[in-house]
Amino acid sequence: MERRTLLVVLLVCSCVVAAAAEASPSRWPSPGRPRPFPGRPKPIFRPRPCNCYAPPCPCDRWRH
């Protein structure tokens, strides 16, 4: 029973340390918005604005 309690305590402590390390402001440039991957931030998909000057406009197909 003592061994199981020790394992639970170690597991909880490791989770607390991991959460504290992720939320530390020294690791991230902006502490309010942590990034999931420190080396490569996930790119945000933004559709390009479409400027059509000709009648057969390809943007009409993209807009729903």
From Swiss-Prot:
It comes from the Eukaryota. Disulfide bonds join C50-C59, C52-C57. Disulfide bonds are important for activity especially against Gram-negative bacteria, since the linearization of the peptide causes a strong decrease of activity on these bacteria. Residues 1-25 form the signal peptide. Interacts with chitin through the N-terminal region (26-48). This interaction may be important, since chitin is a component of the fungal cell wall, as well as of the crab exoskeleton (permitting a possible action of arasin in wound healing in case of lesions). Residues 22-43 are annotated as: Disordered. Mainly expressed in hemocytes. No or very low expression in heart, gills, inestines, and epidermis. Residues 63-64 form a propeptide. One of its GO terms (biological process) is killing of cells of another organism. Keywords: Antibiotic, Antimicrobial, Chitin-binding, Disulfide bond, Fungicide, Immunity, Signal. It comes from Hyas araneus (Atlantic lyre crab). Residues 26-48 are annotated as: Pro/Arg-rich region responsible for antibacterial and antifungal activity. Residues 49-62 are annotated as: Cystein-containing C-terminal region important for stability but not essential for antimicrobial activity. This is Arasin 1. Antimicrobial peptide that has a large activity spectrum with activity against Gram-positive, Gram-negative bacteria, as well as against fungi. Shows activity at micromolar concentrations. Displays minimal inhibitory concentration (MIC) values lower than minimal bactericidal concentrations (MBC). Synthetic peptides with similar activities than the full length peptide (composed of the first 23 or 25 amino acids (Arasin 1(26-48) or Arasin 1(26-50))) may have a dual mode of action depending on the peptide concentrations. GO terms for molecular function: chitin binding. Residues 31-43 have a biased composition (Pro residues).
